[in-house]
Amino acid sequence: MAFTSKLKVRFADIDWARVVYFARFFDFAHRTFEDFFNEHAKLPYAAVLADRKVGFPIVSSTAEFFVPLRLGDTARVQMEVLKLSKRSVTSRFTLYKDETDERCAVIVLKQAAIDTSTFTGTELPDDIHALLSAHLVAA
């Protein structure tokens, strides 16, 4: 089951060619990851980092780009968990131009779980593992 977030393309997101700068697609993916916690899980991402002391640095990423997004477009971002272990999560973020349903990009991120007080690897807390597990897609 995919989690979906919608993000409006703003002036700060575009480059000189008037399309979304490629690095912003990674930002859109991470904002969707944060929204997953904030909106779907009702577990504020800031609290996960600060109070729960669990962080998710990216250890691997891939991207494919298909159709540009432009100022004023709405990006619909679908997040699916591809792989989940006790210490990491690999998620796919498929970005669509909401107005036309065109697929714009696919970003895959592998994120390790770390203890934010020591910046060392750690296991995912059981509740967070369960939240992510509910969005695991069949291979």
Say what each PLM segment does.
Residues 1-59, 115-139:
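Hot-dog-fold acyl-thioester-processing enzymes
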Residues 68-74, 81-139:
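HotDog/MaoC-like acyl-thioester-processing domains
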Residues 38-84, 89, 107:
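Hydrophobic beta-strand-centered segment that forms part of the acyl-chain substrate-binding groove
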Residues 9, 19, 63, 91-94:
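Intrinsically disordered, low-complexity segments enriched in small/polar residues
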Residues 6-10, 64, 110:
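Generic structural detector for well-ordered beta-strands
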